[in-house]
């Protein structure tokens, strides 16, 4: 053990912590492209940037495929950036003059919104305008990541996972919390 040099981030003698921080690389797989390296999950989406929106528990990402919005794998075996299969998992964050956020699909140009079918309330991406049913607010989730909250009258409703095989995006009931999403910035 005498030949091992240890680089320390603290001093045993003074108890002082250095002014620098070293963070490990989150994804050390050299086969993954650089845009797969996420922005820290604590970073909220902002206008003008493009994101992959991922459920950190399942690893599934919000995807538009064949006109249907849902969750799909986002790993290298089933690459979510391959536009040849008709899928789009890149969402451009926009902001209107009243500061409401919207998420526009990079492939279709359609926004995430809701269908207003309150018996079976789902999210969809079928309109090319950023109107009230496509207005979102993002709030930090206590478990990390961020909740996507849609405007509903004078309040908010959260986005949850549900439906068939837990691959659909459903509107939460009044007062119910939502998923903690990670926003992974896509670098061009």
Show the residue positions of the predicted features.
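Lectin-like carbohydrate-binding module/patch detector with strong preference for beta-trefoil
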Residues: 2-188
């Amino acid at each position: 053990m005498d030949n091992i040099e240890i680089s320390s981030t603290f001093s045993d003698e003074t108890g002082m912590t250095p002014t620098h921080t070293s963070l490990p690389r989150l994804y050390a797989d050299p086969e993954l492209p650089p845009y797969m390296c996420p922005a820290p999950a604590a970073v909220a989406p902002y206008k003008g940037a493009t994101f992959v929106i991922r459920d950190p528990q399942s690893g599934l990402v919000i995807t538009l495929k064949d006109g249907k919005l849902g969750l799909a794998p986002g790993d290298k075996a089933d690459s979510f950036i391959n536009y040849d299969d008709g899928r789009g998992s890149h969402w451009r964050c926009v902001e209107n003059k009243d500061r409401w956020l919207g998420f526009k699909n990079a492939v279709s140009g359609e926004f995430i919104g809701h269908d207003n079918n309150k018996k079976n309330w789902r999210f969809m991406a079928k309109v090319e305008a950023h109107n009230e049913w496509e207005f979102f607010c993002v709030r930090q989730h206590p478990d990390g990541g961020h909740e996507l909250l849609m405007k509903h009258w004078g309040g908010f409703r959260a986005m949850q996972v549900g439906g068939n095989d837990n691959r659909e995006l459903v509107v939460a009931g009044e007062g119910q919390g939502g998923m903690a999403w990670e926003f992974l910035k896509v670098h061009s």
